[in-house]
Amino acid sequence: AVRRLAIRRHHTATHILHWSLRQVLGDHVKQAGSLVDDERLRFDFSHYDAVSEDELLRIEELANSLTLSNERVDSTESSKDEALAKGAIAFFGDKYGDRVRVLSAGPSVELCGGTHVSATGDIGIIKVISEGSVGANLRRIEAVAGTRTLNLLQQDRRVIADVARLVGSGPDDLMIGVQRKV
């Protein structure tokens, strides 16, 4: 049950990140592939340039704003033409029948037959852990959600505390301690 919930969190978070990427980078962003498991999510997308640190922060902020708003996540069935006419995003190369499932998570509306949480708040916090190139005009973003985000933050806190001890400072004035040692 814990593993399945983690997968549902990461799968729904993938849709929300796709929406956030399009809001920050532009409508040219299209999904090129993804991987979802209980540990993380990976999302490949079309984009012509590296995503800056500021853009990544805005993407995270938008995604987490949507998760924290605790919007209902709905899955409905309709004809493919009706879904597309209402603005649902379909993925190039995917084969769809005449009837499709439409996933709605706030402003994110996509064709998807996968498993999801029932409200965006069930995802928890989404944290982007990497972004990079995987080919010409193709980027990859990796992220975690839910308890994996908590685990990551706790791990980061331990590393910060260890480095602070090494440089003789507290975690809150770590940069000062590092600058003294450099």
What kind of region is each of these model predictions?
Residues 2-4, 47-51, 132, 145-149:
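A generic structural motif
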